[in-house]
């Protein structure tokens, strides 16, 4: 069995007016089915702004990349920015 890679992204909306639940669903739908979103947390930033923390798992393969994930995130309406917070190889 091949190893997997775990990534954690923090995704910021482009304004406080963005519906965070809609943004969460749009991001998950954009990444699926290729990338597995294991968990999503909503984080209060301040001044009415909330961020998403995405826990993503993918196979360690040339067919999958963090560059592609970031390209998909940029294409979602309402995403103002993102940051890769954690990246680790998983193997059992």
From Swiss-Prot:
UniProt keyword annotations, A-Z: Elongation factor, Protein biosynthesis
CDD domains: EF1B
MF annotations from Gene Ontology: translation elongation factor activity
Pfam name, any one: EF1_GNE
Gene3D superfamilies: 3.30.70.60
Superkingdom: Archaea
Keyword Transferase on entry: no
Family: Belongs to the EF-1-beta/EF-1-delta family.
Free-text function comment from the UniProt entry: Promotes the exchange of GDP for GTP in EF-1-alpha/GDP, thus allowing the regeneration of EF-1-alpha/GTP that could then be used to form the ternary complex EF-1-alpha/GTP/AAtRNA.
NCBIfam families to which the protein is assigned, alphabetical: PRK00435.1 (NF001670)
Protein name: Elongation factor 1-beta
Species of provenance: Pyrobaculum aerophilum (strain ATCC 51768 / DSM 7523 / JCM 9630 / CIP 104966 / NBRC 100827 / IM2)
Lineage: Archaea, Thermoproteota, Thermoprotei, Thermoproteales, Thermoproteaceae
């Amino acid at each position: 069995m091949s190893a997997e890679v775990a990534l954690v992204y923090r995704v910021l909306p482009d304004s406080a007016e963005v519906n965070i639940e809609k943004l969460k669903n749009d991001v998950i739908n954009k990444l699926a089915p290729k990338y597995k979103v294991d968990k999503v947390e909503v984080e209060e930033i301040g001044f009415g702004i909330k961020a998403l923390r995405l826990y993503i798992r993918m196979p360690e393969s040339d067919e999958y990349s963090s560059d592609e994930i970031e390209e998909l995130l940029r294409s979602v309406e309402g995403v103002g920015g993102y940051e890769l917070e954690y990246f680790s190889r998983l193997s059992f």
